[in-house]
């Protein structure tokens, strides 16, 4: 037994050294005509450059963008996976986003970047992507007006319980935890209804699933040598699998009940009671689009809903934390939090206003503050990553040849902080898009509709926070409406002390993670 524990580390170390030597002597092919950024003249230069990207990826991308990307030139950067990537300039984005999957594949990147092969999933990626695109597009985005009352009701209940209702004294609240709680419960209310969103045991299990699922997708897909992935995959996937099974045990009976309810309504051949519950609408969409599901349908749907919940809640929670960090640390001259309070108070004067979709269109300043925060704080430093599929490679618009298997992408974080596209881009200008929208509406005869392209949920080739083109996030309209309601409710009902400075985000590989230790002081406002 002693010899076993001695031999294993020695063998692993030897294998690691051999792999590093192999990477140095036989590197992945990359375009020789493009400039390199992040590589140095040193022993084991390529492996060391890759290791530096674990904590320094955003800095490398920014340096490359400043030297080459801003001038419209592609460049090559190292990556934690030991596979160099080509970063394209902004003027290549429309070309990149319109290439067919057979030429530039986003699916191949998802499998590797998210560690799909090591996750506890039964369905294949194509099936999941098709399911999410259809369900989100038809069952959620088109029913936002109908589910807004439930969104508001759950936000009110959760914010009140999380931040308190004492108008006499201040209360210390962990911002990240508060946002996660609000997003988790409201998201579950929309997905699964009232029973699960207030089940404390289920919510704790789901939170553990989201944490381990996030760790799986973040760590496994960005681990340096490929041979570490199976090891890390086993270690991280075990708890992920356990919490997924526990979560499915709560969700599956609900799905089965909704399936029986839908079948019963069809058998009655009557209008029945139309339900706007997301699960029910999803089941209707599955039947309508004739999505083929092998095996137990209830288990499949429950699993898909859980992975959808993870994707929606993890990203929206991080975005909400970023937004409030920006709002509370904004320049005192702007008095931003009070400005948003006044806007919300002028719009939401009654319970009916909180449930009215038209109220959302009036939140010009809030929408602008959200878009500005998403612009400045991308959750990923790279965007639109795609893999070259043709065996003979492809030609970039500028004539450079990129070989088969290489990844192309855009340095989204660096691009969205370029003064060429956004004056004073390094600063947080919460009313930037409100001003631009007012200017666009003043110049155009179409009025308010002329500024829609500046809405927080509207992607462009200069605003990739929700990706772009065919890759655009299908749930972005839901996410922005949820964020608007949260900001409005908190601003109307709570005083919050400003932050002296904005805590820096932590970078790990491509991910930019907002502070999860920042605490804020809140107090319930006295309602006149």
From Swiss-Prot:
InterPro entries: Cyt_P450 (IPR001128), Cyt_P450_E_grp-IV (IPR002403), Cyt_P450_sf (IPR036396)
Membrane-spanning parts: 3-23
Catalytic activities: 4beta-carboxyl motiol + reduced [NADPH--hemoprotein reductase] + O2 = 2alpha-hydroxyl, 4beta-carboxyl motiol + oxidized [NADPH--hemoprotein reductase] + H2O + H(+); 2-deoxypolytolypin + reduced [NADPH--hemoprotein reductase] + O2 = polytolypin + oxidized [NADPH--hemoprotein reductase] + H2O + H(+)
Subcellular location: Membrane
GO CC, any one term: membrane
Amino acids binding heme: 473
Biotechnological applications: Polytolypin and biosynthesis intermediate compounds show antifungal activity and can efficiently inhibit the growth of the pathogenic funfus Candida albicans.
Pathway: Secondary metabolite biosynthesis; terpenoid biosynthesis
Pfam families per UniProt: p450 (PF00067)
Alphabetically ordered keywords of this record: Heme, Iron, Membrane, Metal-binding, Monooxygenase, Oxidoreductase, Transmembrane, Transmembrane helix
Biological processes per GO annotation: secondary metabolic process
Keyword flag Iron: yes
Requisite cofactors: heme
Family: Belongs to the cytochrome P450 family.
Protein name (Swiss-Prot/TrEMBL): Cytochrome P450 monooxygenase polB
Organism the protein comes from: Polytolypa hystricis (strain UAMH7299)
Source organism phylogeny: Eukaryota, Fungi, Dikarya, Ascomycota, Pezizomycotina
Gene designation: polB
């Amino acid at each position: 037994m002693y010899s076993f524990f001695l031999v294993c580390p020695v063998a692993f170390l030897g294998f690691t050294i051999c792999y590093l030597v192999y990477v140095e002597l036989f590197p992945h092919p990359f375009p020789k005509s493009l400039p390199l950024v992040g590589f140095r003249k040193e022993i084991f230069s390529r492996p060391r450059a890759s290791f530096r990207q674990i904590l320094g990826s955003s800095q490398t991308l920014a340096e490359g963008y400043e030297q080459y990307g801003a001038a419209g030139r592609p460049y090559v950067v190292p990556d934690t996976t030991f596979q160099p990537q080509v970063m394209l300039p902004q003027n290549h984005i429309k070309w990149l986003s319109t290439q067919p999957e057979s030429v530039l594949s986003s699916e191949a990147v998802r499998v590797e970047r998210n560690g799909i092969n090591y996750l506890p999933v039964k369905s294949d990626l194509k099936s999941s992507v098709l399911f999410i695109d259809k369900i989100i597009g038809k069952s959620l985005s088109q029913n936002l007006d109908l589910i807004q009352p439930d969104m508001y009701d759950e936000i009110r209940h959760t914010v009140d319980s999380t931040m308190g209702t004492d108008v006499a004294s201040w209360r210390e609240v962990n911002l990240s935890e508060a946002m996660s709680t609000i997003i988790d419960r409201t998201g579950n209310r929309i997905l699964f209804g009232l029973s699960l969103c207030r089940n404390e045991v289920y919510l704790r299990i789901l939170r553990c699933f989201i944490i381990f699922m996030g760790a799986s997708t973040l760590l496994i897909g960005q681990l340096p040598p490929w041979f570490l992935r199976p090891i890390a995959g086993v270690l991280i996937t075990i708890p992920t699998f356990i919490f997924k099974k526990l979560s499915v045990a709560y969700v599956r009976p609900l799905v089965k009940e909704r399936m029986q309810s839908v079948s019963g309504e069809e058998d009655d051949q009557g209008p029945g009671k139309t339900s706007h519950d997301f699960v029910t609408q999803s089941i209707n969409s599955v039947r309508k689009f004739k999505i083929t599901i092998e095996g137990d349908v209830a288990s499949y749907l429950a699993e898909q809903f859980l992975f959808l919940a993870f994707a929606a809640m993890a990203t929206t929670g991080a975005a909400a934390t970023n937004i409030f960090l920006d709002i509370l640390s904004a320049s005192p001259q702007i008095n931003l939090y009070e400005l948003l309070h006044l806007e919300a108070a002028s719009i939401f004067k009654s319970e009916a206003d909180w449930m009215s979709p038209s109220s959302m269109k009036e939140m010009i300043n809030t929408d602008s503050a959200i878009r500005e925060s998403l612009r400045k704080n991308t959750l990923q430093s790279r965007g639109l990553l795609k893999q070259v599929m043709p065996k003979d490679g492809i030609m970039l618009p500028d004539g450079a040849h990129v070989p088969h298997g290489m990844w192309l992408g855009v340095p989204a974080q660096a691009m969205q902080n370029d003064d060429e596209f956004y004056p004073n881009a390094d600063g947080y200008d919460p009313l930037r898009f409100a001003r631009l929208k007012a200017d666009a509406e003043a110049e155009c005869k179409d009025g308010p509709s002329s500024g829609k392209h500046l809405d927080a949920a509207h992607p462009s080739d200069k605003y990739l926070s929700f990706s772009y083109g065919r890759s655009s996030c299908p749930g972005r309209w839901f996410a922005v409406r949820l964020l608007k309601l949260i900001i409005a409710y908190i601003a109307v009902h709570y005083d919050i002390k400003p932050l002296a400075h904005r805590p820096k985000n932590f970078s790990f590989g491509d991910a930019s993670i907002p502070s999860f230790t920042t605490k804020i002081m809140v107090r319930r406002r006295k309602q006149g």
